[in-house]
Amino acid sequence: MTKKVAVLPGDGVGTEVTKGAVAVLKAIGERFDHQFEFTYGLIGGAAIDEAGTPLPESTIETCKQADAVLLGSVGGPKWDRNPSHLRPEKGLLAIRKELDLYANLRPVTFYDSLADASPLKKEYIEGVDFIIVRELTGGLYFGKPSERRTEGNKETVVDTLFYKRTEIERIIRQAFDTAVNRRKKVTSVDKANVLESSRVWREVAEEVAKDYPDVELEHMLVDSAAMQLIRNPKYFDVVVTENMFGDILSDEASMLTGSLGMLPSASLTADGPSLYEPVHGSAPDIAGQNKANPIAAILSAAMLLRHSFGLEKEAAVIEQAVESVLHAGHRTADLADGNHYLGTDKMVEAITAVIANDSAISSIMTAYS
């Protein structure tokens, strides 16, 4: 198989973790005789510095000509005082719109070997395995108008929460399609006691549920969902919600694993290249120090293989390799208890070594033979 992957390292640790993810994809290519061609583009602060815009046209074209996109991270204090249209995050929002990346999937998985890294007791998180399906191209982040105004001598501000019914339907349908292959339960999260958009959200969820009689649907207010994620995270299977709620809840859920550095994500489109990125930010405080955890980016590469290329076995091998190195006690700085930890590069080397080891991945190879 020959596929093109557009790589957008971005800012901060993004350059380091995408380098690790590319190394793992190359190891998979060698192991399974696939050819992955990598092209690179600018986004975020790096693009502002070099091209004067957070998302150059050349980057858009690079992405559209690829079969999938691998992103690092964007942002940093260097650009915090820039005008709104020259903020690094605008590049991320723009690429989502350009590629119509409407569905963001964020799996949250418990690793037994990382139980001590979680702020919750093991009995609360053991067995946690759920996925947040977040709508990604509507809501407050994209609604217009979004501006400051002067009315008389007073400054006012306005943001707009805007959704089309079709946008709500397609993300909820994505959640049900995901649940069919899991434990067949969808928790739809909203604020229907206050927001009209959430009341429409509930109506659409009920309509879509009729097409999936084997999948259970429940509604939950976002404040209750935020509480349940900590109180009883094993309760959830598939959580579907609008853009801002999903942004907040998925970051909250990330701490169940002990570190943002463990959580991958996929941003899917119905037609064209989908985008894969770690949930964590650019972490400028550790950028360039070989301290970043590359696992979220590497697991994002596994999601890329699964969702964009249909390479389920290869994705499972990456996930097994990650689990193996964690079980062996290898940790990056964010997960380590003390001063003994692997640098970014050594963690990548440990994972690629497992991929190349026949005995280490024999169970996966047998399962898919």
Swiss-Prot record:
Keywords: Amino-acid biosynthesis, Branched-chain amino acid biosynthesis, Cytoplasm, Leucine biosynthesis, Magnesium, Manganese, Metal-binding, NAD, Oxidoreductase
Annotated residues for binding of substrate: 96, 106, 134, 223
Compartments, record wording: Cytoplasm
Gene Ontology biological process: L-leucine biosynthetic process
Entry GO CC: cytosol
Reactions performed catalytically: (2R,3S)-3-isopropylmalate + NAD(+) = 4-methyl-2-oxopentanoate + CO2 + NADH
Entry EC no(s): 1.1.1.85
Gene Ontology MF terms in the entry: 3-isopropylmalate dehydrogenase activity; magnesium ion binding; NAD binding
Pathway membership, UniProt: Amino-acid biosynthesis; L-leucine biosynthesis; L-leucine from 3-methyl-2-oxobutanoate: step 3/4
Annotated positions binding NAD(+): 76-89, 281-293
Site note Important for catalysis, residues: 141, 191
Presence of keyword Magnesium: yes
Cofactor-binding details, from the entry: Binds 1 Mg(2+) or Mn(2+) ion per subunit.
Alphabetical list of InterPro entries matching this protein: IsoCit/isopropylmalate_DH_CS, IsoPropMal-DH-like_dom, Isopropylmalate_DH
Top EC class of this enzyme: oxidoreductase
Co-factor(s): Mg(2+); Mn(2+)
Main location: cytoplasm
Residues annotated for Mg(2+) binding in this entry: 223, 247, 251
Quaternary assembly: Homodimer.
HAMAP family in the cross-refs: LeuB_type1 (MF_01033)
Family according to the record: Belongs to the isocitrate and isopropylmalate dehydrogenases family. LeuB type 1 subfamily.
Functional note: Catalyzes the oxidation of 3-carboxy-2-hydroxy-4-methylpentanoate (3-isopropylmalate) to 3-carboxy-4-methyl-2-oxopentanoate. The product decarboxylates to 4-methyl-2 oxopentanoate.
Name recorded for this polypeptide: 3-isopropylmalate dehydrogenase
Organism encoding this protein: Priestia megaterium (strain DSM 319 / IMG 1521) (Bacillus megaterium)
Organism lineage string: Bacteria, Bacillati, Bacillota, Bacilli, Bacillales
